[in-house]
Amino acid sequence: MLNKFTNKISRYFGLSNEFGVDLKQSEVKKRAIEFLKWESLGDLLPYRTYDSETGLFINQESIGFAFETGLYLGSDDRLENELGGLFKNLLPEGSSIQFLLSGTAKVDHIISNWENGSHGDEILKSLEKKRAKYFRKLAEDGKAKEFRGIVSVSVPVSENNAVVRKKILELKKQVIGTFSTRGGDSRSFDANELIGYLSDILNYDGSIKRRKGEWNEHEMLSKQIVDRDRQYSVAEDEIGIDENNYVMRTLSVSRYPSMWSFGAMSHLIGDSLNDHLKIPSAFFIHLGVYIESGKFKKAGMMAKASRVESQANSPLGKWIPALKREAQEWSFVREQLEKNERLIRSQYQVMIIDKPERIDKTEQLMISLYRSRGWEISRDKYIVLSSLLSMLPMTWGDGMSEDMSYYKKTRRSLSYEPINITPLQGEAKGSSTAGMLLTGRRGQLYYWYPFDKDLGNSNYNVAIVGQSGKGKSVFMEELAASIMRQKGRVYVIDVGRSFEKEVKNFGGQYIEFNAKSKICINPFTNIIPDETGDVKEELSLVKLVIAMMAAPKEGTTDYEDSIIEQGLMEVWQEKGRNADLQDIIDWLLKEGEKDDATKKLGKKLYSYGNDGTYGKYFNGKANINFNADFIVTELGELKGSIQDIAFLVMMLMVQQKVMQGDRSQETGIIIDEAADKLKGKHGADFIEGFIRRVRKNKGALIMGTQNLSDFYSSSGAEAALMNSDWLCCLSQKPEAIALLKKSDKFRISDGQQKLLESVDTKQGEYAEVMIMGSGQAMIGRLILDPYSLILYSTEPSEFNAVQKLCESGMSMEEAVTKVAKERYGSA
């Protein structure tokens, strides 16, 4: 048999026959190599034109279509049944379907979208440029990637007419519909997209930018893919691009694992638990499936099954045990064929592209990755050009399936088998909103933003846990910056100065409580009635604060609560926003002349009256004006119970400001290490009321603790956790993870538990976080540029170095830049 690829080359040189081709010494091969020195690889591609009305590609011997589909994260029976339906029922006999998963550094569009925010803030723009520059370098070094899944179908045709195109168009709708039913994003390729995608592969030059195709409908499609000045050199086992600036190698499977599943395909894009088995280069995984013509092949298989079964049951079977096993296998095949399973031919391939000096190491890494999962793959020799062409979309409909069969690279199986090795597993791609910029463990660059509606959560609240020194504060600071980048507002109530440098760097408002500060946070001053003129909901939270002032440990009784509520309403009716804590105390003492319980309440609040220790904070008109988009209140200098009360009143004032603000503006309210400030029987009521109110105006409570158990240390903290649709876990102790597994709110599987146990932080490189919400769990690595590392650092020497420079007259940005250059050589 003269294979089609050899035939195609032969036609260029007038060679009509070369039966029994010796691929090592073939004159055709020699001339093919010579041909590629002077002609274009595009001359070997089958693409002819594109029908813009139907979205179909008219190829040399087939008609086909291609589309990009969202990649899967794990699997379930429904998914596998949908894929199985493609091979078993939907695709016509003689057609081919190809799956091509690519992992490349073409991430500039992701970085650029993140970099080019519309906020207009110059300081944020400076941070974005520094981070974008850093991530572009990471991508060039193979540490940031994008995984894409391209599916193509091609049907050989003897004629191209409206009837044929109509049938294939209907097939296209059904196939794309199969992938769309799972809620994924499937997008049909047009001519521009096919040209751009194939150009990125065949003109590979290490760029992190995607090429944009520009289709000229008056020229053959295949002529528009390969650059006219691109040169290739074909060796026996690799293809060099432009004098071996980059090298392509293809690898085929020599042994499949005995047990495998569709979900396990995620292990073959890089090991999620071992950085040493992470693929640094561009790579492509291809599965081609050809649907055999049924009746003749099926009859032959049934006959062979009967023959083997007969031999196994003969006296010969007693002496040859392998016959029994073979008979059992063929018996199973016959049963499946009787159930209308189809016969297919398939091929699984891998291609890597890298610099010549790195390609051997990359190849060995790929082989090791597959071997660690029970596969054996090896480099193709003498057919590397055919292998390359056979991986490209729709080429199987133009004879490449026959060529691969001729080279003994395909295997025949039942139609359900390819499901398990379909390369459509990727890494999480997060949200569409350019919030936090993270990478997956295999390098997928993605955004995460808790306010993104497309993620399907019912609220925006976030619970964050991370041991000391594992990056929790940095993660929260970066989340704050992300909210500002989306034109949102951020309120931080802090104890420990974690946010001081950041808020000053961004020109925000820094409010510090200390012995010298003349701050008044009277909760009455900013109360504004709702649309109906009612203030009951506002006063309900003030009531909880006063109750905690009166009885911070034991809590107030129901009777005492009713007294406080009555006093609030009467004082409000008399004085409105001019009321203060002394007015409440006066009312209680006056009413207490008739009731001892009321009198006791008044006395319990003495510390917060005019003559009390803390009276200055709560009497008179509140003088805090929130006049920035980033506001940090530092309570670290306050000690004892006043810190807890100030915390609650600041929460109340933030809520008031959010409710008075623009309902379209997203607001993050960040509190760190504050679980113990929400204790007492009213803690849960306060938090639930707070969350319910701010949610109406796109507000999110973002609460951080060191351990998951901290969320169960007080009723208020537990309420915060139970009302959070997002849980972000940085490095945790095993006992905390065990607690999470028992949680009613966030349930994790055994596999997710194993992932969470592996979450770690490498100082100066990245902090890992497992983000749970919207029905999924994803690992993200927060990687910071040198400037941000210093900006967010709480390491004493770095923190103090910045502080000293600021005290000498430098701006925060200048000080951070100087220290970053000293520590890391750049900023």
List each model region and its residues.
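Hydrophobic anchor at the beta1->P-loop junction of P-loop NTPases
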Residues: 464
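Post-Walker A helix-loop "phosphate-sensing" segment adjacent to the P-loop in P-loop NTPases
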Residues: 481-491, 506
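Walker A (P-loop) phosphate-binding loop of P-loop NTPases
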Residues: 469
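Hydrophobic positions on the alpha1 helix immediately C-terminal to the Walker A/P-loop
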Residues: 475
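A short helix-turn-beta junction within AAA+ P-loop NTPase domains corresponding to the substrate/partner-engaging
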Residues: 508-511, 716-730
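P-loop NTPase motor domains
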Residues: 77-82, 86-92, 275-277, 292, ...
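Extended, folded cores of ATP/NTP-driven motor/assembly subunits in large transport
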Residues: 1-423
